[in-house]
Amino acid sequence: MSPKTETKASVGFKAGVKDYRLTYYTPEYQTKDTDILAAFRVTPQPGVPAEEAGAAVAAESSTGTWTTVWTDGLTSLDRYKGRCYDIEPVPGEENQFIAYVAYPLDLFEEGSVTNLFTSIVGNVFGFKALRALRLEDLRIPPAYSKTFQGPPHGIQVERDKLNKYGRPLLGCTIKPKLGLSAKNYGRAVYECLRGGLDFTKDDENVNSQPFMRWRDRFVFCAEAINKAQAETGEIKGHYLNATAGTCEEMIKRAVFARELGVPIVMHDYLTGGFTANTSLAHYCRDNGLLLHIHRAMHAVIDRQRNHGMHFRVLAKALRMSGGDHIHAGTVVGKLEGERDVTLGFVDLLRDDFIEKDRSRGIYFTQDWVSMPGVMPVASGGIHVWHMPALTEIFGDDSVLQFGGGTLGHPWGNAPGAVANRVALEACVQARNEGRDLAREGNEVIREASKWSPELAAACEIWKEIKFEFDVIDRL
């Protein structure tokens, strides 16, 4: 950029354009405990130096603009500006690097993911000096995270509400996702819950369409839950999708769900938006509802390796905005997810304190202090043969969700649920006895299928089903 000019109060205002690195590249800066830290993967245009590109990211996501303005003299840029404090090359990439940026806490509204993202991943992603830009990770300091309510209830409170301990929870998305009448939909919910599942689920795009209005679906699903609970003696639930075109309509649906006495509602947090999601999370805590979160649209944001935002950032944002469950990939199913990377953001969802670990894509140590954890949901192209791997990978504090892997059972919905419950109980028992599920998992399933005809039928129909594609998002 040229020409270069500097604005100094002692000599008055000088108009013009200056290099961002003169103000926003500060390698000597020592980060503060209260700073929000960001790691950006930067691919600059040819000829743009790394220091200038990193400084441009810091400037355009905080106080900077393209030219010197006289109102700079009315405030303290040193207090409010973002700072690119470190740059490191990306191994194996010729013109790409990680730029570390520190933001002072005063730049952000308390308790607002919306404001946080508007600044950090706003206009800067369209900046012409950059060919591509990806936000890899954020460090949220306790001074900021404590301004958020976080999940409505969290993992331990959910287990206490359900009275279910020592194993993953089992779920199922009702299929076909669109086209069923409310009564037939409720029938499928009942059959799956009666067969042994803990939860059933609205698919993400089930809202209130002409073939099934939301109120009818809520009523028939509540009836199915009550009937299944009475027959099994277990607490059951169905994720009633409250996502709507307006926040007011969304809250109206959540209120009706509470009046029906169901334990959980659902929200599509990316398509619905963070403001709506935080509002719903507050309502759920105040009214005793669990909140299941679907991440529909995430791959538009996080799938490309060089541009967008990694899902670990969206996961952290969800923990602050509020949700008791969130879909997190499967590692073994039909949806994207490398094992180490997936387990990295699963820990960021569940644990209180997570150490920096670049081998898992965790760029910063994260301390959530007392914020409740979020239960990861494994869903998408999974079936009974995946149960040992899922149990071993995700552990007890997770939801394993089989849609087609339940309703695709050759004998019907209830036998499909039975097959999954038997497979899960067998895997948990084998693990508790000290068996290695990673090595002996298939044998555990075969042994269990000898005394469960439902599981045997499921094993037979899905024995050849695999989703073997290369993972796009690698470290």
Curated annotation (Swiss-Prot):
Keyword Heme: no
Localization (cell): Plastid, Chloroplast
GO CC, alphabetical: chloroplast
Active site: K175, H294
Coiled-coil regions, chain positions: none
Protein name in UniProt: Ribulose bisphosphate carboxylase large chain
Pfam hit, one: RuBisCO_large
The gene coding this protein: rbcL
Chain positions with N6,N6,N6-trimethyllysine modification: K14
Keyword Cytoplasm: no
Organism: Pinus edulis
Classification via PANTHER family: RIBULOSE BISPHOSPHATE CARBOXYLASE, RIBULOSE BISPHOSPHATE CARBOXYLASE LARGE CHAIN
PROSITE patterns for the chain: RUBISCO_LARGE
Modified residues (N-acetylproline): P3
Cofactor(s) required for function per UniProt: Mg(2+)
Record keywords, A-Z: Acetylation, Calvin cycle, Carbon dioxide fixation, Chloroplast, Disulfide bond, Lyase, Magnesium, Metal-binding, Methylation, Monooxygenase, Oxidoreductase, Photorespiration, Photosynthesis, Plastid
Gene3D superfamilies, per the entry: Ribulose bisphosphate carboxylase, large subunit, C-terminal domain (3.20.20.110), RuBisCO large subunit, N-terminal domain (3.30.70.150)
Propeptide: 1-2
E.C. no: 4.1.1.39
SUPFAM superfamilies in the record: RuBisCo, C-terminal domain, RuBisCO, large subunit, small (N-terminal) domain
Misc note: The basic functional RuBisCO is composed of a large chain homodimer in a 'head-to-tail' conformation. In form I RuBisCO this homodimer is arranged in a barrel-like tetramer with the small subunits forming a tetrameric 'cap' on each end of the 'barrel'.
Described purpose of this protein according to its UniProt entry: RuBisCO catalyzes two reactions: the carboxylation of D-ribulose 1,5-bisphosphate, the primary event in carbon dioxide fixation, as well as the oxidative fragmentation of the pentose substrate in the photorespiration process. Both reactions occur simultaneously and in competition at the same active site.
Modification N6-carboxylysine, positions: K201
Residues annotated for substrate binding in this entry: N123, T173, K177, R295, H327, S379
Subunit structure: Heterohexadecamer of 8 large chains and 8 small chains; disulfide-linked. The disulfide link is formed within the large subunit homodimers.
Cofactor note text: Binds 1 Mg(2+) ion per subunit.
Post-translational modification remark: The disulfide bond which can form in the large chain dimeric partners within the hexadecamer appears to be associated with oxidative stress and protein turnover.
CDD domains: RuBisCO_large_I
